[in-house]
Amino acid sequence: MDTEEVKRGRGRGRGTRARGRGRGRGRGRGKKIDDSSIADAAALAASSCAALEDSPGRLDASEDSVMQELDKDGELETPGALEEPLPHGALGAVAASGNMTPATQQPQVLQQVPPPVMSQTTISLSLARAVDMEADISQLEAPTFTTLSRGPPEPMLRLKWNHKVSLIGEKVLNPMIHCCDQCDKPILVYGRMIPCKHVFCLKCARAEPIKSCPRCTDKVLRVEQSGLGTVFMCTHGGSRYGSSGCRRTYLSQRDLQAHINHRHVAPQPPPLQPQPQLSAMAEQPKMTDLGGVGLGLELHKQRKLSESSVPISVSASIASRPVLSRLPLTGGVGNIGSIGSIPPPGSAAAAQNAIHGGHSTLTLANLTRINNANAQECHQGKASLHHTLKKGTPHQSESVADASYYSSVLASFGSAAGNPGSGPPGGGATAAAQPANPSGSHSAVGPGALIGGSTDAPTGGSSGNWQQSQYYR
């Protein structure tokens, strides 16, 4: 019997202890045991210890079963349960069951389970106390490091943010400290008088309704508030840190510099040299313009000089020039139709030709040829007049028109010499001027038209044709 009980007490398939549990669980892999399973295991261990006191093998079997069923919490409390004295009824039942057969042992064990439940109340209370002590420690969270924002920490939440703040200063980059003229204290907030722009501290500026500025006694319209470091003061006439001088204030360095340039910098007198240069530049276009008033006066003076330098007979012929100069203008085309048709300078037709550039194709070489031919035909006075005209600055359109006009006048002198109506004085004058001809190469025109005064109109026409060929050569 003992050997059979020993065999039944060992192994995995023990009948009484395999109840409510699957097979195949190894040592140390048991399920978590609740309070009822711990009480059942304690009762079974107590009964086995009492029934098998004489057999050491059964004690080993009971210890193995306790090791399998209980975890660390159960192992700490199980020795206390084993040491407790069992009731007398339980001892008697265990002693009586020792003489019974194994077949009737299982119902007896089931009957013996309820009495030890009364003693398990102390075990459950002690276990509850132990769990409560450890629960306080298990509720503490281990420190974890994460990038998730968990909000402000607890010490920051305990802070109060509704404190009253009193600012005692303001951070300004290198401020210039000025003192108030009324209270002699450094100015932290400026009271700026408008429009005189003098400053005091804001308290003194608004202390009473000020009608005038205490510094300059000007009328004050309003007081403007400005912060420290925003005011730029003019120190002209005084020191930087003193209270004398201009002491006007501006809100930017640019405005302050404009005030200094306007109020305190003396305006420099304009230089005297550019004025004569400007006057010379203004007079230069007048000199270059042949139709201008200045050149007209100069030409008039030159004509007076040339008239005074010629003989009396020549001056008489020159005096008749205004009468003869009207012939090409009033008498149609005639002898000099191609050249005399050019209007005199200053007239409306000449201005129109100058605008349209009708005679711009003539070159300076042709102009000099015409002047040389006229100088050879005319007397010394006329040649000197042409030389004075050539000294002027050649302006293309007007100079050509001017030279052609005087060439037509010279041609009219030649035709008037051959006209019988001109009288002996005109013929005598031209005959007297004949020795002044430097060369006789143009004798076909000169002697036939000038000597004797008996040449008729075709001779004058031939001279006009010759001038026309010289003009367009």
Curated annotation (Swiss-Prot):
Residues 420-429 have a biased composition (Gly residues). Its EC number is 2.3.2.27. Pathway: Protein modification; protein ubiquitination. Pfam families: zf_Hakai (PF18408). Belongs to the Hakai family. E3 ubiquitin-protein ligase required during early development. E3 ubiquitin-protein ligases mediate ubiquitination of target proteins. Required for epithelial integrity and midgut morphogenesis. Associated component of the WMM complex, a complex that mediates N6-methyladenosine (m6A) methylation of RNAs, a modification that plays a role in the efficiency of mRNA splicing and RNA processing. Its function in the WMM complex is unknown. This is E3 ubiquitin-protein ligase Hakai.
